[in-house]
Regions:
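C-terminal motif of bacterial Sec signal peptides marking the signal peptidase cleavage site
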Residues: 16-19
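Edge/loop elements at the starts and ends of beta-strands within beta-rich repeat scaffolds
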Residues: 66-74, 85-90, 97-102, 200, ...
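A sequence/structural signal for flexible, mid-protein segments enriched
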Residues: 135-137, 141-183, 187-190, 195-196
Length: 277
């Protein structure tokens, strides 16, 4: 239960209602585009091409970052399907609320049963209650990292929720352009990150984060679809998460009832009689 709860919490925090961006269903694309014979590959062969490549990469990052979602508060409801090699759960309901740089609040409900778990995350702590087994978990945020074997911080969780790119750095290389999608790679200290963005407006289609230590064989792939707009914010209402390390975890998330910058509360109490771990 501990790992399942942690995975659900991360999956929810992993990943506008008026004008729907049509036809951008969730669809996978290889990293980078594998058939390069008909596409423009930006290479570095001489000083002129190096300068042009650097200028393009800078513009690419600027346009991608111009789509970053800025907010003070956020709330949403979502449905989750969750699958591992040993278990599968469908139709999980969740409520999520967030105050930037301060709180992430999640309530998870199962069909018929009702609320089964609630969690609140701060920049340095994770508190969760398992209502089914009447257990409270009080942990440093590092605990979630240890359980999931994925290094992240509070800001990374915020970006996962909102749909901003994670582990994006300025070290862009291996850029491949097609009429529909631009693919590129960048490096951080621990990870190599691969990105696909739509060529017309530079919003995320897909990203994949891989551990540089190949012996671990671990990666997280995020796919974004069904973009909707609310007050100029482009929000991916459908997310697919695929986590792989020895075994796999698949999560599908459908967001609805999304609100930005509205008053939110974060109720969290540990009922009497709950054991603490």
């Amino acid at each position: 239960m501990k790992q399942t709860l942690a995975l659900i919490v991360l999956s929810i925090v992993s990943t506008g209602l008026f004008s729907c961006r049509h036809s951008r269903q969730i669809a996978g694309t290889s990293f980078p585009v594998t058939d390069t014979t008909q596409h423009n590959i930006i290479s570095k062969t001489d000083s002129a091409s190096v300068a042009a490549s650097n200028a393009y990469n800078k513009e690419l990052l600027s346009k991608l970052r111009s789509n970053y979602i800025s907010f003070n508060t956020f709330s949403a409801k979502l449905k989750i399907d969750f699958e591992t090699e040993s278990k599968q759960m469908s139709g999980i309901n969740a409520n999520m609320r967030m105050q930037k740089d301060s709180f992430i609040w999640i309530s998870v409900s199962a069909p018929i049963i009702g609320e089964v778990a609630r969690a609140i995350i701060t920049p340095d702590s994770l508190k969760a209650i398992d209502k089914f087994h009447k257990i409270a978990y009080l942990r440093d945020l590092r605990y979630a990292q240890d359980v999931l074997n994925i290094p992240f911080d509070f800001k990374t969780l915020q970006d996962l929720i909102i749909g901003n790119p994670v582990y994006l750095t300025d070290s862009v290389y291996q850029v491949v352009k097609t009429p529909a999608v631009i693919s590129f790679t960048c490096d951080s200290t621990i990870f190599t990150s691969l990105f696909n963005v739509f060529a017309d407006d530079y919003i995320l289609q897909q990203s994949k984060v891989m551990d540089k230590d190949s012996t671990r064989g671990r990666s997280v792939e995020l796919t974004y679809g069904e973009y909707k707009s609310l007050d100029k914010i482009k929000f991916a209402t459908r997310r697919r998460v695929f986590v792989e390390e020895k075994s796999y975890t698949k999560i599908n998330m459908d967001f609805n009832k999304i609100d930005f910058d509205q008053p939110v509360s974060f109720p969290f109490t540990i009922p009497s009689g709950y054991s603490r771990e």
